[in-house]
């Protein structure tokens, strides 16, 4: 066991109660030094002693002082009967006090009581709290800097493909927006309930012109779903065809001239043609050939029908006899007659 000396000042009444002698006359002021045990490993003391220094002389006799020392083994009373003994006692008490002060342990040795494990535990807790605070600050700062509706925000919410998926044709699986259990629509009162909150829709009133513009704009959004129909100029629009999907082509266009010549069933059957000239191109070519042949026949027939008056203008004046002239006239009349009969037959056919 180690001990630390402590300085205690006792009054007269406390000293009398501790000694237990009623007849003992103590001085007015005493200085008592006692040793108090403290758990220190580096110094060990087994004795517990105390001594009393009398600061002022007293009228008590030396015999009484000797009796007091015999009654209490642990208390040593030093008395000075004359003024010549006071300096010696004071020097002895001061030296004893200095020796006790030198035995006090420094602060460094008291700090060794803290174990190394507790220090490391404290360091780990402090580092954890610091890292959590830094992470929370960084997350909050990044959310503030990231604008709502940016590309990164849309990718994070799944509304836009990321840069590495833009070339992939496979679509992502999204939830059905028209069958969302968290969104409830009420068509009667025009209210929408989303996430537990009810929103009332404001009424929208559009003029007829605005309604037609809106319908056309919405119809263009689904233009890819409706096929484009080609009609010849002057034809009537079928009842089940949207006028916005009709494209007018001129009457002299090859597509317009071959519409009646191409059979729809044949066109459907020849969709997967792999060999030879495509069916549509061949049909268009054949139709154009027929029309050209018909035009050429009409021109030939028109050239064959020549009037007699116009033919006389192209004839040269010959100086022959009357017989030759009569023969030529008969031949011309016969040729004209055969030409007219052939033209009538072609018209009838």
Swiss-Prot record:
Disruption phenotype: Heterogeneous population of chloroplasts with variable size and multiple division sites. Abnormal subplastidial localization of the key plastid division proteins FTSZ1 forming multiple rings. Normal shape and number of etioplasts in cotyledons. The double mutant mcd1 arc6 exhibits similar chloroplast defect than the single mutant arc6, including the abnormal localization of FTSZ1 to short filaments and dots within chloroplasts. Residues 1-52 form a transit peptide. InterPro entries: MCD1 (IPR034572). Residues 329-343 have a biased composition (Polar residues). It is a single-pass membrane protein. It is found in: Plastid, Chloroplast inner membrane. One of its GO terms (biological process) is chloroplast fission. Keywords: Chloroplast, Membrane, Plastid, Plastid inner membrane, Transit peptide, Transmembrane, Transmembrane helix. Residues 53-116 are chloroplast intermembrane. One of its GO terms (cellular component) is chloroplast stroma. Residues 315-349 are annotated as: Disordered. The chain crosses the membrane at residues 117-139. The keyword Plastid applies. Its main location: plastid. Residues 140-349 are stromal. Required for chloroplast division. Together with MIND1 and ARC3, regulates FtsZ ring positioning in chloroplasts in an ARC6-dependent manner. Determines the site of chloroplast division in concert with MIND1. Not directly involved in ring formation, but required for MIND1 and MINE1 localization to regulate FtsZ ring formation during plastidial constriction. Interacts with MIND1. Interacts with ARC6 in the chloroplast stroma and binds to FtsZ2-1 in an ARC6-dependent manner. This is Protein MULTIPLE CHLOROPLAST DIVISION SITE 1. It comes from Arabidopsis thaliana. The lineage of its organism: Eukaryota, Viridiplantae, Streptophyta, Embryophyta, Tracheophyta.
């Amino acid at each position: 066991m180690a001990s630390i000396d402590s300085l205690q000042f006792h009054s007269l009444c406390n000293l009398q109660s501790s000694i237990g002698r009623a007849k003992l006359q103590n001085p007015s002021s005493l200085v008592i030094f006692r040793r108090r045990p403290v758990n220190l490993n580096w110094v060990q003391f087994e004795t517990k002693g105390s001594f009393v220094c009398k600061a002022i002389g007293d009228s008590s006799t030396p015999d009484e002082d000797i009796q007091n020392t015999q009654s209490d083994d642990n208390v040593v009373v030093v008395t000075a009967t004359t003024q010549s003994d006071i300096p010696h006692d004071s020097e002895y008490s001061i030296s004893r006090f200095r020796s006790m002060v030198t035995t006090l342990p420094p602060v460094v040795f008291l700090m060794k009581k803290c174990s190394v494990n507790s220090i490391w535990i404290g360091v780990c807790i402090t580092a954890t709290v610091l890292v959590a605070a830094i992470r929370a600050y960084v997350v909050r700062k990044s959310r503030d800097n990231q604008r709502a509706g940016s590309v990164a925000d849309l990718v994070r919410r799944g509304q836009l493909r990321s840069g590495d998926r833009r070339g992939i044709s496979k679509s992502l699986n999204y939830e059905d927006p028209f069958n969302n259990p968290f969104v409830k629509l009420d068509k009667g009162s025009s209210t929408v309930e989303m996430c537990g909150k009810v929103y009332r829709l404001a009424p929208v009133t559009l003029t007829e012109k605005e309604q037609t513009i809106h319908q056309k704009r919405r119809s263009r959004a689904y233009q890819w779903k409706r096929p484009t129909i080609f009609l010849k100029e002057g034809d009537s629009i079928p009842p089940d065809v949207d006028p916005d999907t009709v494209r007018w082509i001129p009457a002299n266009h090859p597509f317009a001239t071959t519409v009646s010549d191409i059979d729809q069933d044949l066109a459907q059957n020849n969709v997967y043609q792999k060999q030879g000239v495509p069916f549509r191109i061949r049909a268009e070519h054949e139709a154009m050939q027929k029309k050209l042949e018909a035009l050429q026949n009409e021109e030939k027939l028109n050239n064959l029908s020549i009037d007699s008056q116009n033919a006389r203008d192209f004839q040269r004046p010959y100086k022959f006899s009357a017989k030759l002239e009569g023969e030529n006239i008969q031949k011309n009349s016969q040729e004209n007659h055969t030409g007219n009969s052939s033209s009538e037959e072609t018209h009838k056919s």
